[in-house]
Structures are given as C-alpha cells and as structure tokens.
Swiss-Prot record:
Main subcellular localisation: membrane
GO BP terms, alphabetized: extracellular matrix assembly; hyaluronan biosynthetic process
EC number: 2.4.1.-
Gene Ontology MF term list: hyaluronan synthase activity
Keyword Glycosyltransferase: yes
PANTHER family, alphabetized: HYALURONAN SYNTHASE (PTHR22913), MANNURONAN SYNTHASE (PTHR22913:SF12)
Family per similarity comment: Belongs to the NodC/HAS family.
The protein, known as: N-acetylglucosaminyltransferase
UniProt-listed InterPro entries: Chitooligosach_Synthase_NodC, Glyco_trans_2-like, Nucleotide-diphossugar_trans
Cross-referenced SUPFAM superfamilies: Nucleotide-diphospho-sugar transferases
Keywords for the protein's UniProt record, in alphabetical order: Cell membrane, Glycosyltransferase, Membrane, Nodulation, Transferase
Length: 450
C-alpha cells in the first residue's frame, strides 16, 4: 500500500508545482499592459472598416433570437454594417419568421434560409461567400452584444498583423441556477486569465464563437482548409472556433483578446447539457492541440507552458486522485497529503481570483473542484478515447418538409419583402448546393471556454 500512498503524494506534489508555476505566470501575463490604450482616432464612416456580422441559428427561441438581432441593430458603429442571419434548417422556422419580418425594412439585414441542417461551419461559409465586408464578425444566435462591441473589436483589428480578435463572454442567465453561476465564473477565468495571458503574445488559442471577429482577407485564404477539416479520415464536425483560430496562427496572423468588448451568452442550466457541451469541447481541444504543437517553436515559450499546463496538469491530478481512491478502498485510510494539497490550492486560487476580480462570489468557485475531479476528469478521459466520435450529442439533423436539398434559399429583406409575407416567394433566389450529401455535416455551435 506504500506504493499507492507514494504515487498519490508524488503525483499531487508534481501537480502542485506545475500549477503554481503555470498559474503564477498566467496571473502575471494576464495583467493589463502598462502602455496607454490606443485612442479612437477613426472619425467618420469612411475611415472605419466595413463589417459583416454572421449569425448562424438552429431552432433558436424567438425571444432569444430577437434579443440577439436587436443588439446588432443597435450597435454604435460609424462604419458600414451588414448582417447575415443564416437559418440552418430550423424545425421552428414558422415561429421565427415574424422575427425576420421585424427587420424587413432594415437594409443592413439579409436572411439566408437553408433547406436542411448542415451545421454551423457550412452555415457560416454560406454567408461568408455572400458577404463582402473588410471584417467578419461571428456571433451565436443566443448571444447579445454590448452596444460598443463592434467598434472596439474593429479598432483592435486596425493592425494588419491581427487576423482575429474575440471579446469577453459572460452568462446572460447567471442567476438561474448554481450551475450557471459556476459557468459564469468559469468564463471569467477563461477570458481574463487564460485568454488575456495568451493575448500578451498575440496567440489566443481559441477565439470563441459567440463573439469573434476575423479579417476577411485572412479568412478567405483559409476558408478551404476550414471547410474541409478532417480527423482520422472523417469530416470534423465541431470545434470550428478553435480550429479556425489555429489556422490563423499557423498562417502567421496574431489573435487577440479585447476584454472590454462584452458579449452575453446563454449557458447550460442543467448538468446533463453542460457535460455534453464539455465532452464536445474536450474532443475538439484534444484534436486541435495536436495541430497546435507544431506552432509552439515559433511562439513565446509561455505558450508551450500553457499547453503543458492544460494537458499534463489534469493528467497528474487524475493520477493522484485515482491512487488516493485506491488507497482508501484497500486500506480504509484517507490520502491526507493529496486532500490537503488540493484543498489548499483551491482556497488560494479562489481567494486570489476574488481579490483580483473584486467579487467575493469567486470564493464559491471552490465547488467547481468537485465537479472537475469527479465529473470533468473522467469525461476528458472518455473524450480522449473517443476522439473520432463527432456526434453533436444534443442536436439532431432536421430537414424541412418539401425542401429541395440541392438549394440554398436566400430571402433578402433589402427588397422590402419580409420572409413571412405572402409575396416573399418572389424575392427568393436559389443557388445550387453541393450534390454530395456527405459534405452536409453537423457542427458545434458554441466555443470552448477552456
């Protein structure tokens, strides 16, 4: 039994050492830079770049979609703005048609109606190939933006070396359940520690889908690779946000984080949907980490530590916990060194975060340690063993009745015809889709916050 005790103690000690170094450097690099922020020196619509906002939606609730579109319509942006809402074969299209009609008189809005569900990636591409703006902003349909988000992201993108930039994510339903409160804190840590530290070196590893802006010229050069991503000979059907970010870095572009560009998104309020979401994210993270490894020699050494900390850390923690549980099962003695080290690290981290964020609620993030150890670590192990599985888990393909699968239906309210009006059929244009139905895939609609 001494072997189990030694294994648990050594593993947790290595985990503590690695986490202390990694989280310590992350805390330093995530501090706001001391240089003065760039001034808003662009005055007049002619100087601001044109922006195309792309919003893929699938079975989104009418109220949620309406809130999303309202936040886009009310952006305080002096440049040219176009909005492409892509209905990805929703089964509730009749319920959201009135929402489309509300924007029929706004020349900035275009609606693309896909006859069947093809996934977020192909829904995005359908709009990207139709759009023409200097910058492309991807927004999830359950997300609302602060009124200055587009302006702040566009200002960051003034540097031509930057290929992508993301805003800060918060949970719109934070107060609903204990789980949504934890997820909101998880988002804060992911944005203001992990992404902020990565952005110090211009290498945010995942620009999250709810609010991510891309340079159109950079995006177009990578579009074919993005569309045809394969894993073990199969189309990769989720994790598009992380993969597109990795492609940007591989092409030599910087990826940035803008903390004061606030996007509010809906998060899972029950454990089942949360764990299914985490399983998708874990699979996509493992897949694209393999691609990211070849980028590390050209990036700052902190990014290597970041990858090691995020992958080796959970492995050491899992080893210490498994050995500790085995020790308890076989000897009825508690692995006190492991318990005390994990408890101390949890208390220290939550206290430091609470002081830094100036929010006492982060003390309650201690509860996340139990979720991490007993739910997320086993889930990540399962994800690693099932990397080839591309099931969306919470979403099934929907085909609209009587829809022609070879067509994209584009309803353009610019012509003054709402998609729900009796004359809308006359305003519809049809374009052939690929005949190979195997190219129609499902994709994840949320980014990884980890």
């Amino acid at each position: 039994m001494d072997l189990l005790t030694t294994t648990s103690t050594v593993a947790v000690a290595c985990y503590a050492l690695l986490s202390t170094v990694y989280k310590g450097m992350q805390a330093v690099y995530s501090l706001p830079p001391t240089v003065a922020p760039a001034s808003e020196d662009l005055v007049g619509s002619d100087l601001w770049p044109s922006v195309d906002v792309i919003i893929p939606c699938y079975n989104e609730g009418p109220l949620t979609l309406s809130a999303c579109l309202d936040s886009i319509a009310n952006q305080e942006y002096a440049g040219k703005l176009r909005v492409y809402v892509v209905d990805d074969g929703s089964g509730n299209r009749d319920a959201v048609i009135p929402i489309h009609d509300n924007y029929a008189g706004d020349p900035r809005f275009d609606f693309i109606l896909l006859p069947e569900n093809v996934g977020k990636r192909k829904a995005q591409i359908a709009a990207i190939r139709r759009s023409s703006g200097d910058l492309v902003l991807n927004v999830d349909s359950d997300t609302t933006l602060a009124s200055d988000v587009i302006r702040k992201l566009a200002r960051k993108m003034q540097d031509p070396a930057i290929g992508a930039a993301m805003g800060q994510l918060t949970a719109s339903n934070r107060s609903d359940t204990w789980l949504t409160r934890l997820i909101d804190m998880e988002y804060w840590l992911a944005c203001n520690e992990e992404r902020a530290a990565q952005a110090r070196f211009g290498a945010v590893m995942c620009c999250c889908g709810p609010c991510a802006m891309y340079r159109r010229s950079s995006l177009l050069s990578l579009l074919d690779q993005y569309e045809t991503q394969m894993f073990r000979g199969k189309p990769s059907d989720f994790g598009e946000d992380r993969h597109l970010t990795i492609l940007m870095l591989e092409a030599g572009f910087r990826t940035e984080y803008v903390p004061d560009a606030i996007a509010v998104t809906v998060v899972p309020d029950r454990l089942g949907p949360y764990l299914r979401q985490q399983l998708r994210w874990a699979r996509s993270t493992f897949r694209d980490t393999l691609l990211a490894l070849r980028l590390l020699p050209g990036l700052d050494r902190y990014l290597t530590l970041d990858v090691v900390g995020q992958n080796l850390g959970p492995l050491l923690l899992a080893l210490s916990v498994i050995a500790g549980i085995a020790q308890f099962a076989l000897t009825a003695t508690l692995p006190w060194p492991t318990i005390l080290v994990i408890a101390a690290m949890t208390i220290i981290r939550c206290t430091v975060t609470a002081c830094r964020a100036r929010q006492a609620r982060f003390i309650g993030f201690s509860l996340h340690t139990f979720i991490n150890i007993f739910l997320l670590l086993p889930l990540k192990a399962y994800a690693l063993c099932t990397l080839s599985n591309s099931d969306w888990l919470s979403r099934k393909t929907a085909t609209l009745p009587n829809a022609d699968k070879k067509q994209i239906i584009v309803a353009n309210p610019i012509a003054g015809v709402g998609t729900g009006s009796s004359g809308s059929a006359e305003a519809i244009r049809r374009t052939d889709l690929p005949r190979d139905s195997s190219k129609l895939v499902n994709a994840d609609s949320v980014c990884s916050a980890e």
